[in-house]
Curated annotation (Swiss-Prot):
The lineage of its organism: Eukaryota, Metazoa, Ecdysozoa, Arthropoda, Hexapoda. Interacts with the flavoprotein subunit within the SDH catalytic dimer. This protein may be expected to contain an N-terminal transit peptide but none has been predicted. Belongs to the SDHAF2 family. HAMAP family: SDHAF2. This is Succinate dehydrogenase assembly factor 2-A, mitochondrial. Pfam families: Sdh5. One of its GO terms (biological process) is protein-FAD linkage. It is found in: Mitochondrion matrix.
Length: 162
């Protein structure tokens, strides 16, 4: 048994020998430069170039209001980024069923007229100013929802009503 223990210690010595050498080299070397912390709060957001072809969102003038609300509920849940999935799905679950036809059209324009979901997120959280064409009653309601004055926990999307 003592022989096995000694053999194990010899093997471990060979395994950790390069590691020990690197530790001794680290002690003799100067410390690494500090990480640059000046860019922690900078949002890198470039303007879209003019030549970038963006498809036009199809206008659906004859879509019934209930069908439109169902489509918007689905689209609010499936944004492709978790932040907007949570914000818009909880917002739609809370407010969409009470929207008038005009408010529903404003919400449709907001979530489908913008080409970049990060813009919606930054506007709703007041990180960036909202452009005039999207600064509507619905956007103000969304900003109020995002501030979460009620203190509601929003860790997942709300259940769908069946």
């Amino acid at each position: 048994m003592l022989r096995q223990l000694r053999l194990t210690m010899d093997i471990l010595g060979w395994i950790f020998l390069p590691w020990r050498r690197s530790i001794s080299n680290i002690k003799d070397s100067p410390p690494p430069p500090p990480l640059a912390s000046t860019f922690d709060d900078v949002i890198v957001d470039y303007e879209d170039p003019d030549y970038l072809p963006l498809p036009e969102y199809p206008v659906r003038p004859n879509e019934p209001l209930e069908t439109r609300k169902q489509r918007l509920l689905y689209q609010s849940r499936k944004r492709g980024m978790l932040e907007n999935d949570l914000l818009l799905s909880t917002f739609a679950a809370k407010h969409l069923q009470n929207f008038s036809a005009e408010q529903t059209a404003q919400y449709d324009q907001l979530i489908n007229g913008v080409s970049n979901d990060w813009d919606i997120y930054y506007w709703a959280t007041d990180v960036k100013p909202t452009p005039k064409e999207y600064d509507t009653e619905i956007m103000r309601l969304l900003k109020k929802h995002v501030k979460n004055a009620e203190g509601v926990t929003r860790l997942r999307q709300p259940d769908l009503n069946t």
